[in-house]
Amino acid sequence: MQDRRVLSGMRPTGQLHLGHYHGVLKNWLALQNEYDSYFFVADWHAFTTHYSDKIDLNTHVMEMVVDWLAVGINPNISTIFVQSKVPEHAELHLLLSMSTPLSWLERVPSYKDQQLKLNTKDLATYGFLGYPLLQSADILIYKAGLVPVGEDQVAHIELTREVARRFNYLYGREVNFEEKAEIAISKMGKKQAKSYRSLRKTYQETGDDEALIKAQALLQQQQNITLGDRERLSGYIEGVGKIILPEPESLLTKASKMPGLDGQKMSKSYGNTISLRDTAEQIQAKIKRMPTDPARIKLTDAGNPKKCPVWQLHKVYSNKSTCDWVVEGCTKAKMGCVECKQPIINAIEEVLTPIQGRIAKYQADPELIKQIIFEGSEKARSVAKETMIEVREAMGINY
């Protein structure tokens, strides 16, 4: 089941916008119908860059969950929870920090990138340096097999894999490991045991990944061995020991090209967003203020859509016939910029009107939201507690 478990989260540092909707939430909607999905509000992570800001986290957390529900995240098939409601995240983060080399954290690309991007903030903190390790703990504590990320986040998943590999190497070599592994093999039956031994030998002698995949699949099919035996034999294939914290895989998602009001990527940091909660009047005002091709000083001046931020929004929201109409009208000066912007205003309102209707419904029932958070957090914590029992036992602190 763990290889079918997906985990993803968001920091509650402000209102969700169309960039979140197109870049993350639409992916979540597809994933929740295919995987065992865990979606969490990463409230501790909010402090990594906003530790000195007076942000109303309680409001942001509640509004974030309301917005998730309004776009269609279903608590009946997805586990929705809040990071701080599962304190085991912090415990695993602490224990992993004992064996994670400092250089691993310093080389994460986003460490220096974010320092440059947010140069008005003092990010020379232990929390900011260590936040990728907290992300690793977030993932590993649920033994999530898949983490949906864009290409810019793959390095974080690679770090998580290295952290898990190191932990398993240090603490997975239990006393009499080989003897216990051989006993587990004998429980598989002669034919299956022979296949396992053959695949293990092939992998260890040649490094054949196909043999590793087949051996892992063989273990998943076994009914006569315990979960502990399965994890032990999984590590025995690779010669590392019992797999306590499985290594996750990146689930690459299609990058959102959602542009902001100024043509840059839509981001709160750039102040160029359209919120999921913006009124029709606010949407119209924001779109109408958007800059256009500077060559179009007068209505009779021809323009170039490729030099206009508005065109980027047409590529997201407009069909081919509308896009053709825009190109024709702009390049031949047959329409003004106000006229060009109207289809975008209409399209955004069409998307947001039903979402905002559902936001109003959920907002009117705060007790329901609290109950969803409570139940999801309790479910998540029960999984996290099981992982921490294994971790403490492996590290010898289960007294």
Task: Describe every region a protein language model picked out.
Residues 57, 126, 149, 153, ...:
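Aromatic-acidic/polar surface patches that form glycan- and anion
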Residues 2-7, 12-137, 158, 162-164, ...:
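N-terminal Rossmann-like or analogous alpha/beta NTP/dinucleotide-binding catalytic cores
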Residues 18, 155, 161-399:
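Conserved nucleotide- and phosphate/pyrophosphate-binding catalytic cores
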